[in-house]
C-alpha cells in the first residue's frame, strides 16, 4: 500500500466540485448494485436463461455486485475526503478486494470468450466440451486464482517498493503499491495476456461465424439456431469491448506506475482512469438489455410481474374497502340475536350460545 503522502491541493476547496462528484459516484454505485442484482434475478427466475454460458455471466454479475457493495462505497469516501479515514489493516483488505474483483472480472470474460468459441466453432460437440462439471471447475479456478493473486501478493508484500511505512495506524493514502516486477507481472498475466487471447478468440469466432452463415443460408432450422448463437456472441463481444475501453487506461497507468513510480503519474488522471474502470461494472447489465433479446424479455417479465403484483394488491385493497364500506352502510344499527356459526380448523361447525351475534 501507499501509506505516505499529503492531501492533494485540489481536495481542499471546490464545494461545487465535491457535490457534483458525489452525485456522479452515488449514481454509479446504485446503478452497479441494482443492475447486477437484476441480472442475477433474471437468470434465476427465467428458465430460458439458465444455461452454462450464463453461469459465467452470473459469476461476472456477482463480481460486479461485490465490487459495488464492498469496494465502491469506500472508494467514494476516499475520493471525496482525499484521505483514508480507516485503519491500515482495513486498507490492506480494501485494496486486496479491489484487485481480487478486478482479476475475477477479467477471468470471467476470458472464460466467456472460450465458451462462445466452442459454441460457434463446434456446436455439435459443445455439450460434450462444456459440461456442468467443467463449468464448476472453471468457476472455482477463477475465484481461487483471483484470491491468490490479490490477498496473497499484497499481504506478503510482493508489490511493495523499498519504502518503509509509518508504524502508526493512521495513513493518508490507500492504494495498491506497485514495484517494477509486480507491475509488469500483474499487468501482463491478469490483463494484457488474457486480453490478447480474447481478441484472437473473438476474431476467429466472427470469422467462422460469417463462414457458417454463408454456408447454411438455405437451411432454416440451423439458421435460426445459429443466428441466436451469433447474437449472443455479439453481445458478449460488446461486453468485452466495454471492458477494454474502461480498464485499458487504468492498467496502462498501473504498469507505468510500477516502472516510473507514483510521482510520475498525475493523481487526478489516475483517479479518472480508476473510476472509468469501475464504471464497467455498471455497463454490463445495460449491455445485456440492449443487445440480448432473452435478457430484455427477462427484464421485462421481471419488472412487469412486480408492477402487476403491486397493482393487483392495490386493486384488491380498494375492492375490500369498498365492500366493507357498503356493508357498513347497509347494516342496521341493531340486529336480532342469532346463532353465530364458527368454522374451526377441522372443518366441523360449532354453534355459539344464544345471544352471540355476528359483529
Swiss-Prot record:
Subcellular location: Cell membrane
UniProt entry keywords in alphabetical sequence: Cell membrane, Disulfide bond, G-protein coupled receptor, Glycoprotein, Lipoprotein, Membrane, Palmitate, Receptor, Transducer, Transmembrane, Transmembrane helix
Superkingdom in the source lineage: Eukaryota
Membrane topology: Multi-pass membrane protein
Cytoplasmic face of the membrane: 45-57, 115-134, 205-234, 290-359
Keyword Disulfide bond: yes
Residues carrying the site annotation Essential for histamine binding: 98
Extracellular compartment residues: 1-22, 82-92, 160-180, 259-267
Residues anchoring lipid (S-palmitoyl cysteine): 305
SMART domains the UniProt entry points to: 7TM_GPCR_Srsx (SM01381)
Sites annotated Essential for tiotidine binding and implicated in histamine binding: 186
One of the Pfam families matching this protein, by short name: 7tm_1
A GO term, aspect molecular function: G protein-coupled serotonin receptor activity
GO cellular component: dendrite; plasma membrane; synapse
Residues carrying the site annotation Implicated in histamine binding: 190
Annotated disulfide bonds: 91-174
Record-annotated membrane-spanning stretches: 23-44, 58-81, 93-114, 135-159, 181-204, 235-258, 268-289
Family: Belongs to the G-protein coupled receptor 1 family.
Chain's role: The H2 subclass of histamine receptors mediates gastric acid secretion. The activity of this receptor is mediated by G proteins which activate adenylyl cyclase.
Protein name: Histamine H2 receptor
Amino acid at each position: 500500500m501507499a501509506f505516505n503522502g499529503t492531501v492533494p491541493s485540489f481536495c481542499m476547496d471546490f464545494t461545487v466540485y465535491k457535490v457534483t462528484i458525489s452525485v456522479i459516484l452515488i449514481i454509479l454505485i446504485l446503478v452497479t448494485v441494482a443492475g447486477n442484482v437484476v441480472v442475477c434475478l433474471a437468470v434465476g427466475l427465467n428458465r430460458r436463461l439458465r444455461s452454462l454460458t450464463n453461469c459465467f455471466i452470473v459469476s461476472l454479475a456477482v463480481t460486479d455486485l461485490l465490487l459495488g457493495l464492498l469496494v465502491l462505497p469506500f472508494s467514494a469516501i476516499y475520493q471525496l475526503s482525499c484521505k483514508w479515514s480507516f485503519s491500515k489493516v482495513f486498507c490492506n483488505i480494501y485494496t486486496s478486494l479491489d484487485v481480487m474483483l478486478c482479476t475475477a472480472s477479467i477471468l470471467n470474460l476470458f472464460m466467456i470468450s472460450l465458451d462462445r468459441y466452442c459454441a460457434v466453432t463446434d456446436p455439435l460437440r459443445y455439450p460434450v466440451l462444456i459440461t456442468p462439471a467443467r463449468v464448476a471447475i472453471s468457476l472455482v479456478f477463477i475465484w481461487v486464482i483471483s484470491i491468490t493473486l490479490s490477498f496473497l501478493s499484497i499481504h506478503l508484500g510482493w508489490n511493495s517498493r523499498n519504502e518503509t511505512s509509518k508504524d502508526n495506524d493512521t495513513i493518508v493514502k490507500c492504494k495498491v503499491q506497485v514495484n517494477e516486477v509486480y507491475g509488469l507481472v500483474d499487468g501482463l498475466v491478469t490483463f494484457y495476456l488474457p486480453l490478447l487471447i480474447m481478441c484472437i478468440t473473438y476474431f476467429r469466432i466472427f470469422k467462422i461465424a460469417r463462414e457458417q452463415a454463408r454456408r447454411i443460408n438455405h437451411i432454416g432450422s440451423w439458421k435460426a439456431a445459429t443466428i441466436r448463437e451469433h447474437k449472443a456472441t455479439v453481445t458478449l463481444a460488446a461486453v468485452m469491448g466495454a471492458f477494454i475501453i474502461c480498464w485499458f487506461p487504468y492498467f496502462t497507468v498501473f504498469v507505468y506506475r510500477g516502472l516510473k513510480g507514483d510521482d510520475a503519474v498525475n493523481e487526478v488522471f489516475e483517479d479518472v482512469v480508476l473510476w472509468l474502470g469501475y464504471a464497467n461494472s455498471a455497463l454490463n447489465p445495460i449491455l445485456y438489455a440492449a443487445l440480448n433479446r432473452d435478457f430484455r424479455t427477462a427484464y421485462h417479465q421481471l419488472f412487469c410481474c412486480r408492477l402487476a403484483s403491486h397493482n393487483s394488491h392495490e386493486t384488491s385493497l380498494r375492492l375490500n374497502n369498498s365492500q366493507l364500506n357498503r356493508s357498513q352502510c347497509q347494516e342496521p344499527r341493531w340486529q336480532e340475536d342469532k346463532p353465530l356459526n364458527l368454522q374451526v380448523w377441522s372443518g366441523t361447525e360449532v354453534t355459539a350460545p344464544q345471544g352471540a351475534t355476528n359483529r
